[in-house]
C-alpha cells in the first residue's frame, strides 16, 4: 500500500502566529544589515580617520555585555520589555550615528568617540533584542512547532539583513555617489 503523507502546508515552514513578530524582526534587521556592511564606507565618507574595524570590536563587546543581563530578564517573563528597551537603544544609536556627519566638522575626536560609542550601544541593543525575539517565537509555538518557530525567526532575520544589504548598496551607489 502507498505511504500516506500529509499535504504540504504553509504552517509547516512558517509559524503563522509569529508573522507579526516576524515582520517586526525583519524591519529591525534591515538597519543591522546596512550598518554591518556599510559603516566603514560611511565613516570614510564623513572623514573619520580612526580604524573603522574597531567599530565591530566595540559592537561585539556590547553584544557580550548584553548577554550577561538580558537572559535573566527574559527568563523572568519580560520579553516584550527587553525587546522594547533594545529597540529604543538602537533607534537612539542610529540618531547618534547620523549626527556624526555634523560632529566631524566641530571636533574630530568627539566624533570618533561618539562613533565607537554608537557601536557599543548598537551591540547592547541588538544583543538584547535578537535573543529575546528567538524566545518570543519559541514561546508562541506549541512544542510540536518549535522548529517551525525557529525557522520563522531565522527567515525573518536573514531576509531583513538581505534587504538591508541591498538597500544600503543602492543608497551607496545611486544616492550617495552618483556618477
What kind of region is each of these model predictions?
Residues 2-25:
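Juxtamembrane intracellular "pre-TM" segments in multi-pass secondary transporters
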Residues 17-56:
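Extracytoplasmic gate region of multi-pass secondary transporters
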Residues 39, 128-141:
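Intracellular juxtamembrane helix-capping segments at the cytosolic ends
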Residues 49-50, 143-153:
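Loop-to-transmembrane helix entry/capping segments in MFS-fold secondary transporters
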Residues 66-79, 172-173:
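Helix-to-loop junctions at the C-terminal end of transmembrane segments
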Residues 76-88:
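Cytoplasmic membrane-interface "Motif A"-like loop-to-helix N-cap segments
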Residues 89-108:
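C-terminal ends and interior cores of transmembrane alpha-helices
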Residues 170-179:
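A membrane-interface helix-boundary motif in multi-pass transporters
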